[in-house]
Amino acid sequence: PIDIAIRLNQLQKVAEETRLGIPVTFSTDPLHEVPRGGGIAAFSLDGISKWPSQLGFAATRDTDLIFKFGQIASAEYRAMGFRTGLHPMSDLATEPRWARNFGTFGSNADLSSEMTVAYVKGFQGNEINKNSVHTMVKHFPGGGPQEGGLDPHLKSGENQIYPGNNFDYHLKPFQAAIDNGMKVVMPYYGIPKGQTDEDVAMAFNKYILTD
């Protein structure tokens, strides 16, 4: 952590000395999980507190615990110079073959909504202030229904499918986050098949982002 803080402070100093002096907002993927021998978009950093994965938090059904985690992790992020966390993953784990299910709060939209709100408030506080760390809730409006469980970063996994006509179910945790002070969101990479007039990925889809 101290090496990260030194490096980010050095970079921040460079930014402050530019013509406009606009500071840099540094972000990171999750850093607090107990090591489990590899994974996708989740890392474990020595020297900071260790906690369960999101799926582990969901198993406790304890929103007070995840709120406390957010407060502690937020303080550790600020000490290193990070002001945005590229998490939580509020996708619903409805496709068992999807490789990122471990990073979600599970398949229950109501539970995921409750855990997401507690997570956001733990990191950010009830309102944004100097002690806040933004949470980038992802992947809007829900990355769980991957066709075949394939990776949407690749052409082979570009499609999101909704055989149960449950698009709105996947949206619920994100709506809860928006209603409770979420400030940053990451749109998803997949194409929501049959959901909009634009057959393009969610991050480029006018209906998904603005309508």
Predicted regions and their residues:
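Glycoside hydrolase catalytic-domain context in secreted enzymes
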Residues: 1-211
